[in-house]
């Protein structure tokens, strides 16, 4: 282990040296991606004076390339080479940064037909576990992405993800630390949309003109007049725009007209932040006044009063909160006030769009532990790059993770390094994965003793150390711990002695076992004989009896009278028709009448009546009475005037589309009803047919579970039992229950997860137009893209809290997890739904959209890479 520590220390020292080499005195990180090993690194880029270094020590994979020779002269040196990634789906740069410090991060991409195929690559760019942008290199001059972002850990991972047949590539990667307190947001990061200064002719301004190496592009329009000064302009506010940009300004040629910028958004409700920099650079006469207001689509943004420029000194208007154009067209204007004698002026303008990164990075201590484990064993796996847990489809192999709350860091719960050719002792770094539940190190060449720390890991429930060369004794702490411990195939390991039982006790146990087996066999045979003597269940139903004799029992003629001869149909189900009725003159009821052709019979009828007679909960439909007369069976229960949830989600029958807040409340109320069945009943019950059509709504849209014909009891919390028949509705049915026949409360949890996905997306559970794909498949695909707007029901018109939506979506997917052991209980579901509602009620991030692609608008300027 000392040698491993020495190697790790040497690697750490080497990394620090390379980080220092990649930084200049301003703390900049400038990487020339794909710089050949035979070229000098670091080198000074002649036009900017910036120090660029090779990217080789910041990434584990990729190959180097160079743009075609006939294109090299058009581009600066850092953009002539590139790194491309023919292997692996995700390839990531790992950069050391300061946690909670704001950085300007710029990534540049230039294809340059380096491979001679003349096929422009298309791929995704990720920041940690979140999608940053979609890269399409159709432009021969390349493209760039720039963002202002605050890392949540001391490690920043920038990843290129293959999405099709083409190969991802990158030309340069640059990080610039920004001044504390600048470019603040309510939430999210800022993606650069435009950064302009106003001059009729000019070149791109960046370092050393701009101390933060921001790129400023000249812009001017025919209806403007340029004013300039040769004097110095003080630019030392928190944003510190370049002085060269402030020595010129634009004013409208028509002094009474506004100074106007127009563009069209590619998406509705994009959120913007504006930073307008202005300084008075004209000599004003004694009676001259210049003041103006800043407006967006007619909304006055100068809420503290008109903007008044200072003589040769910068002022900056900044958005205090995100602003939307509320449509496709955006109209940003500076309008003079009535008392102003001069038109408005503007020296420079920055426009950013908000981009949300909702997914938290994997817990930092878990990530460090995995890196240390990898270093200890010399593991080199192509997919062990980027965030270990998310996106889910890119999760590191050998790992399982859990993440009940999207805003909290995911945790690693399972590590499987079986048959990985591991040598040495069991790595001490494993103990740093504090929520690890399963550890499999079997069939390697591990030596040494079983470490004491394994017995102190509270979450560990399964340890497999089979097939190694471990020695020594098993630690006392591990022997006392109640877990599954596999140690076979370790011949040098001293196993604890087996406890010997007295012969008399063994004999007694064997005798009792034989007696029990004989009794069970006898009882099964008797049950078979009795069952053979029973009459078919549908020959007559007059024998149906119920445990509760106090309920109202209707005659068939009373049912006819209550329903006015079955005049008004409310719906139809597997049981039969449901009719509207009235009892006691004014009390409205719903009457479910068993159809003679129904696939359900007296057994389901009796089950529903028995359950409704003994359960009483505000979120379960109440039974008024029943009819059992000859072959006529009917249930009479309370009438819920707003019908079922499915109708309202679809908008069928003129039903209104319910908003997001009400949907969350309905979900919570349905969950409360299920929780009562699971833990409030004796014995506990499972519903077995949870779906949107079985969630009914009263006049106040209060939710109540209905249709208990398939409900069954089970032994208790966390347990399951075999079900002789598989029942439920296709798409909502727990696949694990379907395959195993095991019935438990987690079967209802799965169905509830599907219901919640329906409420979130308004997508069909089974999409028959897409090869019968399931809703979980569609949602999983969209989640991996990171765009919540593509997932949410468009009928909601984006009127929801982004964080609340993400939390609900994560909860739904955890409920619908294939393995029932990984699903939450209904009590946990209720807790999470309450958190979602609380998050929604805060109003934070309301109407916040996600913007990934740079807009192609009339203010067009070329992003880096930049031609000479």
UniProtKB/Swiss-Prot annotation:
Q: Where is the active site?
A: 689 (proton acceptor)
Note the SS bond partners. Answer: none
Q: Which GO terms describe its molecular function?
A: ATP binding; protein serine kinase activity; protein serine/threonine kinase activity; transmembrane receptor protein tyrosine kinase activity
Q: How does it sit in the membrane?
A: Single-pass type I membrane protein
Localization per Swiss-Prot or TrEMBL: Cell membrane
Instruction: Tell me the keywords, alphabetical order.
Output: ATP-binding, Cell membrane, Glycoprotein, Kinase, Leucine-rich repeat, Membrane, Nucleotide-binding, Phosphoprotein, Receptor, Repeat, Serine/threonine-protein kinase, Signal, Transferase, Transmembrane, Transmembrane helix, Tyrosine-protein kinase
- Provide the membrane-side ranges marked Cytoplasmic in the record: 522-868
UniProt enzyme class: transferase
Q: Residues bearing Phosphothreonine?
A: 555, 724, 729
Where is it mostly found?
membrane
- Reactions the enzyme catalyzes: L-seryl-[protein] + ATP = O-phospho-L-seryl-[protein] + ADP + H(+); L-threonyl-[protein] + ATP = O-phospho-L-threonyl-[protein] + ADP + H(+); L-tyrosyl-[protein] + ATP = O-phospho-L-tyrosyl-[protein] + ADP + H(+)
Q: How is it modified after translation?
A: Autophosphorylated on Tyr and Thr residues.
The protein here is known as: Receptor-like protein kinase At5g59670
């Amino acid at each position: 282990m000392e040698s491993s520590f020495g190697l790790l220390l040497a690697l750490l020292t080497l990394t620090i040296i390379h980080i220092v080499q990649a930084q200049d005195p301003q703390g900049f990180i400038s990487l020339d991606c794909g710089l050949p090993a035979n070229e000098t690194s670091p080198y000074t880029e002649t036009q900017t004076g910036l120090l660029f270094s090779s990217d080789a020590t910041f990434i584990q994979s990729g190959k180097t390339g160079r743009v075609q020779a006939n294109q090299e002269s058009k581009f600066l040196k850092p953009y002539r080479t590139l790194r491309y990634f023919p292997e692996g789906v995700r390839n990531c740069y790992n950069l050391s940064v300061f946690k909670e410090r704001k950085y300007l991060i710029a990534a540049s991409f230039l294809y340059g037909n380096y491979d001679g195929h003349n096929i422009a690559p298309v791929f995704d760019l990720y920041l940690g576990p979140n999608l940053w942008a979609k890269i399409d290199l159709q432009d021969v001059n390349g493209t760039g992405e720039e963002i202002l972002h605050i890392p949540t850990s001391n490690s920043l991972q920038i990843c290129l993800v293959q999405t099709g047949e083409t190969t991802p590539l990158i030309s340069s990667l640059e990080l610039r630390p920004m001044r504390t307190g600048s470019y603040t947001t309510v939430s999210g990061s800022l993606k650069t949309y435009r950064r302009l200064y106003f001059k009729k002719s000019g070149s791109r301004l960046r370092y050393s003109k701009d101390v933060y190496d921001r790129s400023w592009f000249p812009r001017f329009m025919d209806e403007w007049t340029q004013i300039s000064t040769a004097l110095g302009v003080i630019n030392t506010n928190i944003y510190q725009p370049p002085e060269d940009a402030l020595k010129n300004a634009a004013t409208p040629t028509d002094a009474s007209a506004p100074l106007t910028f127009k563009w069209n958004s590619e998406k509705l409700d994009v959120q913007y932040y504006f930073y307008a920099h202005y300084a008075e650079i004209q000599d004003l006469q004694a009676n001259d006044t210049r003041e103006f207001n800043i407006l967006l689509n007619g909304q006055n943004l100068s809420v503290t009063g008109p903007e008044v420029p200072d003589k040769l000194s910068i002022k900056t208007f900044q958005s205090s909160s995100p602003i939307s154009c509320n449509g496709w067209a955006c109209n940003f204007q500076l309008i003079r006030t009535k008392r102003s004698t001069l038109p408005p002026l503007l020296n420079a303008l920055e426009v950013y769009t908000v981009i949300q990164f909702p997914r938290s990075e994997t817990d930092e201590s878990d990530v460090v532990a995995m890196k240390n484990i990898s270093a200890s064993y010399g593991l080199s796996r192509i997919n062990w790059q980027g965030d270990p847990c998310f996106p889910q489809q890119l999760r590191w192999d050998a790992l399982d993770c859990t993440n009940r709350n999207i805003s909290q860091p995911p945790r690693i719960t399972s590590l499987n390094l079986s048959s990985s050719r591991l040598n040495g002792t069991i790595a001490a770094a494993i103990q740093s994965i504090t929520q690890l539940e399963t550890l499999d190190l079997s069939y390697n060449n591990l030596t040494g003793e079983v470490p004491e720390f394994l017995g102190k890991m509270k979450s560990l429930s399964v340890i497999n150390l089979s097939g190694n060369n471990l020695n020594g004794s098993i630690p006392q702490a591990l022997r006392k711990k109640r877990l599954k411990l596999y140690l076979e195939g370790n011949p040098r390991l001293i196993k604890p002695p087996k406890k010997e039982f007295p012969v008399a006790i063994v004999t007694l146990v064997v005798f009792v076992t034989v007696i029990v087996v004989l009794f069970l066999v006898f009882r099964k045979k008797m049950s078979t004989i009795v069952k053979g003597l029973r009459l078919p269940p549908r020959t007559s139903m007059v024998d149906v009896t119920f445990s509760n004799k106090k309920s109202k029992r209707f005659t068939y003629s009373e049912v006819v009278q209550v329903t006015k001869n079955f005049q008004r149909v409310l719906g139809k189900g597997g049981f039969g028709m449901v009719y509207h009725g009235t009892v006691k003159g004014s009390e409205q009821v719903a009457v479910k009448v068993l159809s003679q052709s129904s696939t359900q019979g007296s057994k389901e009828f009796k089950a529903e009546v028995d359950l409704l007679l003994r359960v009483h909960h505000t979120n379960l439909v109440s039974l008024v009475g029943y009819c059992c007369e000859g072959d006529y069976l009917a249930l009479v229960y309370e009438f819920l005037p707003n019908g079922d949830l499915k109708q309202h989600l679809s908008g069928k029958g003129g039903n209104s589309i319910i908003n997001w807040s009400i949907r969350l409340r309905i979900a919570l109320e349905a969950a409360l009803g299920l929780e009562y069945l699971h833990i409030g009943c004796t014995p506990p019950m499972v519903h077995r047919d949870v779906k949107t059509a079985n969630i009914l709504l009263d006049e106040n849209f209060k939710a109540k579970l209905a249709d208990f014909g398939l409900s069954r009891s089970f032994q208790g919390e966390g347990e399951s039992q075999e079900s002789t028949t598989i029942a439920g509705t296709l798409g909502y049915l727990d696949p694990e229950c379907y395959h195993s026949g095991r019935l438990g409360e987690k079967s209802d949890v799965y169905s509830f997860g599907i219901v919640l996905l329906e409420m979130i997306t308004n997508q069909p559970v089974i999409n028959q137009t897409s090869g019968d794909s399931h809703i979980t498949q569609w949602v999983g695909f969209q989640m991996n893209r990171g765009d919540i707007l593509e997932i949410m029901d468009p009928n909601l018109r984006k009127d929801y809290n982004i964080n609340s939506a993400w939390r609900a979506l994560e909860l739904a997917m955890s409920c619908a997890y294939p393995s029932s052991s990984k699903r939450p209980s209904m009590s946990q579901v209720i807790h999470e739904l309450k958190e979602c509602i609380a998050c929604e009620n805060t109003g934070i991030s309301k109407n916040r959209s996600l913007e990934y692609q740079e807009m192609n608008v009339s203010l067009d300027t070329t992003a880096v890479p930049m031609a000479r």
